[in-house]
Regions:
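Active-site segments that bind and position negatively charged phosphate/pyrophosphate groups
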Residues: 11-130
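Internal alpha/beta core interface subdomains
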Residues: 1-7
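Noncatalytic linker/hinge segments flanking ATPase motor cores
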Residues: 9-23, 38, 147, 163-165, ...
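C-terminal charged capping/lid subdomain of soluble metabolic enzymes
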Residues: 113-191
Length: 191
């Protein structure tokens, strides 16, 4: 939703080359709302082997809704960060969704999102056990140089960072990565 919420659907060309629209943004928003409402309930149910309505809602959000939203309105910084993280060997063992989760936090920092929104997403990730720090992604001590490697790859001309509604530089992204990592440590209270 964050990546799509930043795109002006009147001017945006989606992943498949079509104009973005209100439907894509609405589906992305529904995806986000479903994850927030049912994500923790679904995780807990699955840990006990239970198939509950919350699990079914999350499956629908993760497949159908996110797929249609993606086709209709594309991707932005969160997925570009994922792509940049693939440049660090330490992150190779992490799942796509884990890297995108951290990328979402980076995108929120990059956008200077309200504290309440950052806290909501950080809290959600922490409750689900999703990474909120680079250490959790396998990078023991994040350096500025590593952040720049990720940032430069994320800002490649053919990546999705170009879908942000403002010009983004590798330096801005590196600072957002460092800031997101610091916030993650703060909210985990491990620094």
């Amino acid at each position: 939703f964050f990546k799509n919420n930043n795109l002006d659907y009147a001017d945006f060309v989606g992943f498949l080359g079509d104009k973005g629209g209100m439907a894509g943004l609405a589906l992305a928003k529904l995806c986000y709302e479903t994850l927030m409402a049912d994500g923790v309930k679904a995780k807990v149910a699955l840990e006990k082997g239970a198939l509950t309505p919350a699990v079914e809602h999350i499956i629908e959000a993760n497949t159908l809704l996110s797929g249609i939203g993606f086709e209709s309105s594309g991707l932005a910084a969160a997925h570009a960060i994922h792509n940049g993280l693939t440049m660090l060997p330490e992150c190779h063992g992490m799942y796509h969704g884990e890297k995108v989760a951290f990328g979402t936090i980076v995108q929120l920092v990059l956008e200077d999102a309200p504290t309440e929104k950052l806290e909501e997403v950080l809290g959600f990730c922490i409750e689900l056990g999703l990474p909120v720090t680079m250490k959790e992604l396998g990078v023991a001590e994040l350096t500025r140089e590593q952040a720049m490697i990720v940032a430069e790859a994320a800002c490649a001309p053919d990546d999705t960072m170009c879908n942000m509604p403002f010009e983004v530089t590798p330096e801005m992204v590196a600072n957002a990565i460092l800031g997101a990592d610091a916030l993650g440590h703060y909210y985990l209270m491990d620094e």
